[in-house]
Every structure is written in C-alpha cells, then in structure tokens.
Amino acid sequence: KEEPLTTHADHFNTNYAYSVASYSKGEVFLAQLGYIVGQKTLDNILLDYYNQWRFKHPNANDFIRIAEKRSGMALQWYKEYWVYSTKTIDYGIGDINDAGGKAAVTLSRIGLMPMPLDVQVTYKDGTSEMYYIPVNMMYGNKQPENNLPFIIKSEWKWVNPDYTLQISRGVADIKQIEIDPSQRMADVNRVNN
C-alpha cells in the first residue's frame, strides 16, 4: 500500500512503499510537472534550479518557487497533493451529446487529485484540436506543445467532479476524443481516457 512521500524512511510499513516513494514517485513528479507546465518550460525550470542551487542545500519549496516563477503558474497545490497525500489521478470521458450543432462532452474526475487536462479531439476529416482545461488553483495556462490548434477552456474548479467540455463541431464530425494523449499524467485507469 502506498504511503505519503513525507513518511520518514525508517517508518514506512513495507519496503515496497518505501521503494515507490523514494524512487518512482519522484520521477513521475517531474514527468507530470512537464505535462502541467509544458516540456520546454520544465526544461528551463530544471536549468534554473541547477544554476541557482548547485552545490547548495535546497529544499522542496525552493524547487517549487523556481517552477512557479518560470511557468507563471501557482504549483504549490501540485506539490501538496503529490508529496503529502496518496490521492490518485483518474479522469474519464462520459456522455457526448449534441448541443445546438456542437458537441458537449462530460468529463469526470474519478480520482481525488485534480489535474489540468489536455483533451485531443480528432475529427472524421483527419484534423485534430487540443482543448486545454486548467485547474482553478493554477492561476495560469501552459503554452501549446505541438502544432494542433490549442483552445484554452474555462478552468475546472477542483471541487466539481464533472466538467462539460463544449467542442466547436457536432457529434457526427467526431472520430475520437482522448484525455492526455501524451500519456504523461499518472492516470490510474487510462481505459476511460
């Protein structure tokens, strides 16, 4: 069973929980931060962090401060959820309805950890669009990471388990909808993405 990263090394209940906390979750933290802020921004965060703190003794807040400054986003919420809790990330696509010639897609937060979402919509004509839904705790948006049209939607308030995504075209035009096509978000059940 997973335990919070803040558990002292000598106090983990199992070696497995210690291994996950000590090795895997740190790697996933950085990869997923790239999903939140964008990979180019993450690369710059890591360079800034190295340049400012090499041969010194930083703490976790020093890293988050640099990440917030470089990204222009509030990221303390991300650190708090990832380090101090064992809440999981799980998002799913629910109903897809036609609303006046435009598709209305119900997205659900099944897990208890909120995250911003990249939702790629592929149409039957072969074109695609990337819809970006920030979390209201971020106070900012990432920049587009590919050449797809990048549409920033209204923020998803973390207290709401569901969100209705309005898509610019009708249901009949849609071939596929996918949450996190880059697969950098640590979603525990990608089947419903």
Residue ranges of predicted features:
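Hydrophobic alpha-helical and helix-loop surface patches within well-folded domains
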Residues: K1-T106, I110, P114
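Compositionally biased, low-hydrophobicity segments enriched in charged and small polar residues
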Residues: L46-W53, T164-I167, V188
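Beta-strand-rich binding/interaction modules
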Residues: I89, D95-Y163, S168-P181
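Short acidic/polar inter-strand loop motif in beta-rich domains
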Residues: P181-N192
